[in-house]
């Protein structure tokens, strides 16, 4: 198991604790059944496996390999192992336990190194989940999206310097607000150079707020689910994790963030960055809440961030996130096509590999544009015919012109869950049938389900027959009821695990495979409580506004315990943070900026720097108070009372069991 890769994925996670916990003896994964082998083999006749264009493009411009040394942290923890996917070899036929289409994608994303995209534009691939792009200009270099971790980003820069010479970084660009596109920035530049004006950081409007806020309120649950989505609990091998579809996996180093100095605010905004002309296109609410694309005139290059890649992307992330809107997404791509399609010779994204040649550029833009538009429009067409979310997903088919294009295959997103997300985007979770309006909760409903079906043994006997016939979806669905009715029924857990495992072996989507196989692993062996990550890096905490901080506290208030409590507190953060009135009443914590209550129970005075240290657990409130860094006047017990109503979130909560 990869202890050091737990939960870093695409979130604001920070450093791991140093404690080590024992693992249970794990039951080994099983082989692919005949039904799974048959399902996977059918794909060879359905998809154009003879088309090797992507492999040619993925190798084009190769300069140097990624260093093969394991990247480790100060405590010896593995941050990135370049050899962990060495079992995925280009040219090998897919194993029985991996969907052939996903295997092909895994081979492609495993192609790593420093590449020349065009004269003066270079890209480092497979040193993290995302790519890092380096653009040579008049005075130095501009770095686009410095990976997840400072450690991997530094190795990437060293690789570039070794092959292209030492050049000063004059600018950094964040394409959007996800952590794999800014987290390694301190491995690329020094913040002092940003403050002095030596280095500029460009970003789309709203990036800093979105980077901090998107995951922080639901950070614990999103991180736990991310451990499923990215397969961080699985061993990388042919019966385990083979990649995430978007990249191989995430690094497990230090997430950093330096605030942008220059914001792009509107489509058509042009900036000269180190002698090159950038024409920007805003794309908020597409793949990320804050995102932008651009065209470099001198290079005839479209940078599509993460809106045009070599996969059907998520319009909903299985780790949990706000639903993304396929219609605006499609329109942004159409706008890029109309603005630059007649002159672009290259499409470059921050995942996967570039596309060269105007005809190919236009073809890819049109195909991805129509992919997201088709999902939007046809979901609504079918919904307007009275079909429900699950009925639409079960009957939804892309036209062959879209479905048989490799770049549109569901390696990260999937047609099924993107369609369901689009339904929920417009119509919400309720399907309109009053029988589903107030269903029993999972455990209670499962017990009645098992009772009505004649008991667990009867269900398992029938389910085993369905398993032998290859009906794995139904087996997983029905046996999950038995597990939720009696989580100690190991026979049920094992049968559900077997079914999930076969579904994982058949899955084309990397996240689907990872969810299935992680669920199977936890059903068989229980939840392995590995070292727990902090859910916010120091830079993320420092970037939180006071409003975000108080909202974060409010999420931790146990409303039932605090239902009858009342407290009014003033917080004074000084010149760098302002004053806030905080009120606890009706189990709710409200705050008001710029106001001090005359009837406050207590006033807490501290600097923003001290607040950051307390949030990061670098010191306790008591320690800071004893040192005089926190001053409390009034009724101290009211503050203690408020803090006593706050829940601590258990990270390793159950997912496949109650």
Annotate each language-model stretch with its function.
Residues 1-26:
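Gram-negative bacterial Sec-dependent N-terminal signal peptides
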Residues 140-151, 252, 256-262, 268-385:
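Metallo-beta-lactamase
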Residues 25, 471-477, 484, 488, ...:
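Feature captures hydrophobic
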Residues 446-478:
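Alpha-helical segment of the N-proximal tetratricopeptide repeat
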Residues 139-140, 150-200, 483:
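Active-site metal-binding motif and surrounding structural segment of the metallo-beta-lactamase
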Residues 28-40, 301, 311, 327-391, ...:
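Divalent-metal (often Zn2+) His-rich catalytic cores of metallo-beta-lactamase-fold enzymes
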Residues 107-167, 291-296, 300-306:
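Conserved beta-strand hairpin/beta-sheet module of binuclear metal-dependent hydrolase folds
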């Amino acid at each position: 198991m990869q202890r050091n890769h737990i939960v870093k994925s695409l979130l604001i996670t920070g450093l791991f604790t140093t404690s080590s916990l024992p693992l249970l003896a794990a039951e080994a994964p099983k082989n692919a059944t005949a039904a799974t082998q048959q399902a996977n083999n059918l794909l060879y006749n359905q998809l154009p496996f003879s088309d090797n264009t992507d492999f040619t493009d993925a190798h084009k411009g190769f300069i140097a390999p990624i260093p093969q040394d394991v990247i480790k942290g100060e405590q010896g923890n593995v941050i990135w192992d370049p050899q962990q996917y060495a079992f995925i070899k280009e040219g090998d036929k897919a194993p029985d336990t991996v969907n052939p289409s996903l295997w092909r994608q895994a081979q492609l994303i495993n192609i790593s190194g420093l590449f020349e995209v065009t004269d003066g534009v270079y890209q480092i691939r497979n040193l993290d989940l995302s790519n890092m792009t380096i653009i040579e200009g008049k005075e130095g270099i501009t770095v686009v999206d410095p990976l997840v971790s400072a450690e991997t980003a530094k190795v990437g820069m060293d690789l570039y310097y070794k092959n292209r010479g030492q050049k000063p970084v004059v600018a950094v660009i964040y394409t959007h607000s996800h952590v794999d596109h800014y987290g390694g920035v301190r491995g690329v530049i020094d913040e002092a150079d940003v403050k002095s004006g030596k280095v500029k950081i460009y970003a789309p409007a709203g990036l800093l707020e979105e980077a901090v806020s998107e995951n922080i309120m639901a950070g614990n649950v999103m991180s736990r689910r991310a451990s499923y989505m990215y397969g961080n609990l699985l061993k990388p091998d042919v019966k385990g994790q083979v990649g995430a579809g978007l990249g191989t996996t995430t690094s497990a180093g230090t997430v950093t963030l330096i605030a942008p100095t220059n914001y792009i605010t509107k489509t058509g905004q042009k900036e000269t960055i180190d002698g090159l002309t950038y024409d920007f296109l805003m794309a908020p609410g597409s793949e990320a809440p804050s995102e932008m694309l651009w065209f470099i005139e001198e290079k005839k290059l479209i940078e599509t961030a993460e809106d045009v890649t070599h996969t059907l992307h998520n319009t909903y992330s299985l780790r949990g996130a706000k639903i993304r809107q396929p219609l605006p997404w499609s329109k942004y791509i159409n706008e890029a096509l109309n603005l630059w399609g007649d002159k672009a010779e290259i499409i470059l994204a921050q995942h996967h590999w570039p596309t060269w040649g105007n005809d190919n550029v236009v073809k890819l833009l049109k195909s991805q544009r129509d992919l997201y538009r088709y999902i939007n429009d046809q979901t609504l067409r079918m919904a307007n015919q009275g079909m429900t979310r699950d009925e639409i997903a079960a009957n939804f088919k892309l036209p062959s012109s879209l479905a048989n294009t490799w770049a549109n295959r569901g390696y990260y997103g999937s047609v099924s869950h993107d369609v369901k997300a689009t339904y929920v985007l417009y119509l919400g979770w309720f399907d309109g049938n009053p029988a589903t309006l107030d269903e029993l909760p999972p455990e209670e409903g499962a017990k009645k389900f098992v009772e009505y079906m004649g008991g667990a043994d009867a269900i398992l006997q029938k389910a085993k027959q369905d398993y032998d016939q290859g009906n794995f979806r139904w087996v997983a669905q029905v046996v999950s009821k038995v597990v939720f009715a009696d989580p100690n029924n190991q026979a049920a857990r094992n049968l559900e695990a077997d079914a999930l495992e076969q579904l994982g072996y058949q899955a084309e989507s990397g996240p689907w495979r990872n969810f299935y196989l992680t669920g199977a692993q936890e059903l068989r062996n229980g939840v392995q409580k590995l070292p727990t990550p902090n859910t916010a890096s120091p830079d993320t905490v420092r970037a939180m506004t006071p409003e975000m901080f108080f909202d974060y506290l409010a999420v931790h208030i146990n409303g039932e315990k605090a239902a009858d409590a009342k407290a009014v507190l003033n917080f004074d953060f000084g010149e760098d943070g302002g004053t806030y009135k905080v009120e606890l009443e009706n189990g709710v914590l409200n705050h008001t900026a710029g106001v001090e209550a005359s009837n406050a129970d207590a006033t807490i005075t501290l600097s923003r720097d001290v607040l950051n240290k307390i949030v990061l657990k670098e010191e306790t409130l008591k320690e800071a108070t004893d040192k005089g860094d926190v001053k409390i006047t009034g009724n101290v017990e009211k503050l203690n009372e408020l803090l006593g109503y706050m829940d601590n979130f258990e990270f390793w909560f159950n997912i496949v069991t109650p």
